[in-house]
Amino acid sequence: MQRIGMVANLEKPRVRETALDIINYLESRNVRVLISTRKAAALGCPEKGVAEEEVIAAEGLLALGGDGTLLRAARLVAPAGTPILGINLGHLGFLTEIELTELYPALDKLLAGAYRIEERMMLRGTVQRPEKALTCTALNDIVVTKGAFSRMLRLEVYIDTAYLDTYPADGLIVSSPTGSTAYSLSAGGPLVSPQLQVMILTPICPHTLYTRPLVVPGEQEIRVCVHAPGAEVMLTVDGQQGLHLRDGDVIRVTRARTPARLIRLQDNTFYSLVREKLKEGGSRQDDENPAATVNPETDSKYPHSHPGSTG
């Protein structure tokens, strides 16, 4: 790779320092690092800024932060097919590929082409209104949920043209296999291998005893009709983007045309990640004297503690 894009969550500890060091490390190997004009200015190197379109069109993209940063990156570059390498400076790091301690060997592998691409199904959501249709894409999930002080919703659900049920519930989660380890899991949904092309429909606090999550083939469409006069209803995308819904809105969720493409440098399987990451339950504690990774170019050291955030 000769042109590598970078996105970074600069709100996280150590991200700014790490980003600047990565830039120096890659440039010393004749690799051009592409950063948006806004991010470059925030990093203190405005001369390196380029249009976002150039970042998207890079040969690969580094996502520095946590799982939330990778989710944003996936929505940004998936239509262009740009592969993403997630570098975890967050907390759990279920989606990211490497920890900070593995950074420089991982960059060397990337430049040597010693990696594979793993495709992850994404979701496309459309909110159908008389005046226009609003669209979104998600890697994890598209969620319809009530506001803090709203009564329960009545959500009429169809699979293609077949009526499924009307759910009296606090909301519904439509997740991808990747999102099956996120909000859907917390709401009682199943773990689903990311190799499958399916959607998972998981009700949130249903007001019936028989309602259970449902797995739907990826080639079908899930249609949700909102019946909630006077209630506050929200649609959220990967827990990061939101839209106020109206009574009578129709939400259509299908498999997106293009998948997210994740760079994999290691042999970890989904099943080993489930065992290792979910077993931690987000409760990993920092060591008293955390190990550090060393940049062979600068001898600068970065402790690999894990702050409690997923962005």
Curated annotation (Swiss-Prot):
Top enzyme category: transferase
Region (Disordered), start-end ranges: 278-311
Primary subcellular site in the record, as a coarse category: cytoplasm
Gene3D superfamilies tied to this protein: Probable inorganic polyphosphate/atp-NAD kinase, domain 1 (3.40.50.10330), Probable inorganic polyphosphate/atp-NAD kinase, domain 2 (2.60.200.30)
Pfam families hit by this protein: NAD_kinase, NAD_kinase_C
Reaction catalysed by this enzyme: NAD(+) + ATP = ADP + NADP(+) + H(+)
Active site per UniProt: D67
InterPro entries, per database record: ATP-NAD_kinase_N, ATP-NAD_kinase_PpnK-typ_C, NAD/diacylglycerol_kinase_sf, NADK
Listed cofactors: a divalent metal cation
Entry EC number(s): 2.7.1.23
Compositionally biased spans, kind Basic and acidic residues: 278-287
GO BP, sorted A to Z: NAD metabolic process; NADP biosynthetic process
Binding residue positions for NAD(+): D67, G68, R72, N140, D141, R151, D170, T181, A182, Y183, S184, L185, S186, Q240
GO molecular function terms attached to this record: ATP binding; metal ion binding; NAD binding; NAD+ kinase activity
Keywords recorded for this protein, A-Z: ATP-binding, Cytoplasm, Kinase, NAD, NADP, Nucleotide-binding, Transferase
GO cellular component: cytoplasm
Localisation per UniProt entry: Cytoplasm
Family classification: Belongs to the NAD kinase family.
HAMAP family: NAD_kinase
Function text: Involved in the regulation of the intracellular balance of NAD and NADP, and is a key enzyme in the biosynthesis of NADP. Catalyzes specifically the phosphorylation on 2'-hydroxyl of the adenosine moiety of NAD to yield NADP.
Name the UniProt record assigns to this protein: NAD kinase
Organism of origin: Moorella thermoacetica (strain ATCC 39073 / JCM 9320)
